Regions:
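Short, low-complexity disordered leader/linker segments with a strong preference
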Residues: 1-31, 61, 104-111, 287
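Hydrophobic alpha-helical segments within soluble ligand-binding/sensing domains
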Residues: 32, 74, 129-155, 200-202, ...
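Extracytoplasmic "Venus flytrap"
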Residues: 33-54, 58, 62-76, 80, ...
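Short, solvent-exposed amphipathic alpha-helices that sit
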Residues: 43-60, 136-143, 167-186, 200, ...
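Flexible loop/hinge segments that line or gate small-molecule binding clefts
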Residues: 88, 96-135, 154-156, 248-261
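Hydrophobic alpha-helical
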Residues: 88-107, 176, 194-252
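Hinge/cleft segment of the Venus flytrap/periplasmic-binding protein
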Residues: 160-168, 179-180, 267-301
Length: 301
C-alpha cells in the first residue's frame, strides 16, 4: 500500500511536469530569426535595435545572430535558426552571391526570407527592404555638383567602395556614376574597395593620398569608411569634401565638427522594424509587397 502511494505520487508529479511543459510551450512567443552581416558597425546595431523594439511590441521573440562578415558563419547561423523553428528569417547578407545557398537552406524548410539593406542574387525572397541605394548614390553626386557648380575643374574624385559583390556597393556606385560621369570636369583618380570597414577606409585613403594628394572629393559607400578617410585626410593636411552613406551617429558628430562634409542618411532602425512588421503579416497570412523602400535624406551642417 505504501509502495502504491509512492507510485501514485511519482505519477502525479510527472503529470504535473508534463502539464507545466505543455503550458510553457503554449505561452512561448513565435520566434523570428535575424542574421546580420556584422554587429561591428553602428548601422546594423541600429537595425537590430529597431527590429527588437518592433518584435517586443508585436509579441515575438527576436533571435539575432552576427555573421561577422563571414559567409560560412552566415550559413551556420541560418541553419541554427531553422533548427530553432523560426517563423521567418530576416537576413542582411554578407555578400549578394554567397548568400544564395544560405537562402535556399531556409527555402527548403518553407521559412519566409526577407532581405534587409542588401539583396540576394538568388533563392526565393519573400520581400526586400532597403533604402533606394541607386537614388542615394545620385543624391551624393548631386550634392557634389552643387558644391562645385562655380568651378571649372578638373576636380579630382576618390570613390571608396564597399564589399565587392554586395548589392549596396553596386547600387551606390551606379547611382553616383549616373550623375558624375555626365560632367567632364570631374576626374576619378582612384576607385578602391575598403569593405565597409573604418580601419580599411583609413588604410586605403592613406595609400591614395601617398600616390596623389591632389584630391577635392571623396565619396565613401558608407560612413565607417568615410570616417576612416577623414582621419587620413586630417593627418595629411589636405582639404577635401568627404561624403558618406548611412547617417550613423559618429558620422553626424563628425559633420557637426566640420570634419566629414555630408552623409546620405538612411534609417536603419526603420528597416529593422519594417522587417519584423512584414514577418508578422506573413505569419498572420496577410499579403505583402516584394519590395519596400525606406526614405533617404542628405545630412550636412
Amino acid at each position: 500500500m505504501h509502495i502504491n502511494k509512492k507510485i501514485f505520487s511519482v505519477g502525479l508529479m510527472l503529470m504535473m511536469l508534463m502539464t507545466s511543459f505543455i503550458g510553457c510551450g503554449r505561452d512561448n512567443k513565435p520566434k523570428i530569426g535575424m542574421v546580420l552581416s556584422t554587429l561591428n558597425n553602428p548601422f546594423f546595431v541600429n537595425m537590430k535595435d529597431g527590429a527588437e523594439k518592433e518584435a517586443e511590441k508585436l509579441g515575438y521573440d527576436l533571435v539575432v545572430l552576427d555573421s561577422q562578415n563571414d559567409p560560412a558563419k552566415e550559413r551556420a547561423n541560418v541553419e541554427d535558426l531553422v533548427q530553432l523553428g523560426v517563423v521567418a528569417l530576416l537576413i542582411n547578407p554578407t555578400d549578394s552571391d554567397a548568400v544564395v545557398k544560405t537562402v535556399e537552406v531556409a527555402n527548403k524548410s518553407n521559412i519566409p526570407v526577407i532581405t534587409l539593406d542588401r539583396q540576394a542574387n538568388g533563392g526565393k525572397i519573400t520581400s526586400h527592404i532597403a533604402s533606394d541605394n541607386i537614388k542615394g548614390g545620385e543624391m551624393a553626386a548631386e550634392y557634389v555638383l552643387d558644391k562645385f557648380k562655380d568651378e571649372k575643374g578638373p576636380i579630382n574624385v576618390v570613390e571608396i567602395q564597399g564589399i565587392p559583390g554586395a548589392s549596396a556597393t553596386r547600387d551606390r556606385g551606379e547611382g553616383f556614376h549616373n550623375i558624375m560621369d555626365k560632367n567632364d570636369k570631374f576626374n576619378f583618380i582612384s576607385i578602391q574597395a575598403a569593405d565597409f570597414d573604418r580601419q580599411k577606409g583609413l588604410q586605403v585613403m592613406e595609400n591614395i593620398i601617398q600616390a596623389n594628394p591632389n584630391i577635392q572629393v571623396v565619396f565613401a559607400h558608407n560612413d565607417e569608411m568615410a570616417l576612416g578617410a577623414v582621419k587620413a585626410i586630417k593627418a595629411s593636411g589636405i582639404n577635401a569634401l568627404v561624403i558618406g552613406f548611412d547617417g550613423n551617429d559618429d558620422a553626424k558628430d563628425s559633420i557637426d565638427a566640420n570634419e566629414m562634409t555630408a552623409t546620405i542618411a538612411q534609417q536603419p532602425d526603420l528597416i529593422g522594424a519594417l522587417g519584423v512588421e512584414l514577418a508578422n503579416k506573413i505569419y498572420n497570412g496577410e499579403s505583402i509587397k516584394d519590395k519596400i523602400a525606406a526614405d533617404l535624406k542628405v545630412y550636412t551642417k
